[in-house]
Swiss-Prot record:
UniProt-recorded name of the protein: DNA-directed RNA polymerase subunit alpha
Keyword Hydrolase appears in the UniProt entry: no
Start and end residues of each stretch annotated as Alpha C-terminal domain (alpha-CTD): 246-326
Subunit description: Homodimer. The RNAP catalytic core consists of 2 alpha, 1 beta, 1 beta' and 1 omega subunit. When a sigma factor is associated with the core the holoenzyme is formed, which can initiate transcription.
């Protein structure tokens, strides 16, 4: 079986070119028949959903308390400004989160280039993007929170996070990939025909080039597939652990932690029913849970600490077989 796998053709990068503003075309060939669509679909989905990037997640504008306000002397209303901020293309090169300021006196246009980094290592990729227009001599100051993340994050998923006074949460598209499409053409190597050639077109926000993006996507897929390479059959005679092999505290339902209704419902929605399930989750795992924010996370950590337990605890052979069957 291993020997036959080595006989498969391995594709090579035969072309990488820029076809437009932040648009790239990559061609890989030859691939075994059918692998063009198999790998093309996998890479496309991974590129669109799993690339790391930065985005504006919160803004506080001096004198503005909510998104339905208007600002005297400013052409755009606050909702339009928020929409413009969602299109800001930046990258935090070192920090996970950072606060930056834009402060201008009109009349003028406020663009991404007006962001004051104040020593923060940040790169802007659409500096000419207009955020707001001041029509008179009015003064405008806004504080932006920029965060690093993966995929798409709605403002409602961060309702538990502490906001600055007057801070307005934004839906954030962290992905540096705007669009991915692919086609599969016929290829040939010597006398071997019916092979595939994979043509991938990628449009980015300018923060990453196509080759780097594909490499990152391939690494993600490789890491996910590595578990399948190392699959081992469980011997039938091997005794599976039962509840008697675990600390009774781990077998208790999360309801016994007496968490707030919000926190408890978030855990149940993620099928976290037992304390043993919960303590194996890391802080990052829980923060990715919809509607579970920092406040709920701190509550969970405090309750677990009172019981001498901590998050990110590995439990070998969990869950017990009789617990799974309940």
């Amino acid at each position: 079986m291993q020997g036959s796998a080595r006989n498969f053709l391995k594709p090579k990068l035969v072309e990488s070119s820029q076809t437009g503003v932040n648009e790239f075309k990559v061609i890989l060939e030859p691939l075994e028949r059918g692998f063009g669509h198999t790998l093309g679909n996998a890479l496309r989905r991974t590129l669109l959903s799993s690339m790391t990037g930065s985005a504006v997640t919160e803004v506080a504008i001096d004198g503005v308390m909510h998104e339905f306000s208007t600002i005297e002397g400013v052409q755009e209303d606050v909702l339009d400004i928020l929409l413009n901020l969602k299109e800001v293309s930046v990258m935090l090169n070192t920090a996970e989160t950072a606060q930056v300021v834009i402060e201008k006196k009109g009349p003028c246009e406020i663009t991404v280039a007006d962001i004051e980094a104040n020593g923060i290592d940040i790169t802007a990729f659409n500096p000419d993007k207009v955020i707001a227009t001041i029509n008179d001599e009015s003064h405008m100051r806004m504080t932006l929170k920029i965060s690093t993340g993966i995929g798409y994050d709605t403002a409602t998923s961060r309702t538990d996070e502490a906001s600055s006074i007057g801070g307005m949460q934004l839906d954030a598209s962290f992905s540096p990939i705007r669009r991915v499409s692919f086609t599969v053409d016929a290829a040939r190597v010597k006398q071997k025909v019916n092979l595939d050639k994979l043509n991938i077109t990628i449009e980015t926000n300018g923060s990453v080039n196509a080759e780097v993006a594909i490499k990152r996507a391939a690494i993600i897929l490789q890491e996910q597939l590595s578990s399948f390479v190392e699959l081992e059959l469980v011997e039938e005679e091997e005794a599976l652990p039962t509840s008697e092999d675990f600390d009774p505290q781990l077998l208790a339902a999360v309801d016994e932690l007496e968490l707030t209704v919000r926190s408890a419902n978030c855990l149940k929605a993620e099928q976290i029913y037992y304390i043993g399930d919960l303590i194996q989750k890391s802080e990052q795992d829980l923060l990715r849970t919809p509607n579970l924010g920092r406040k709920s996370l701190n509550e969970i950590k405090e309750v677990l600490t009172e019981k001498g337990l901590n998050l990110a605890t590995s439990i070998e052979n969990w869950p017990p077989v009789d617990l799974m069957s309940e």
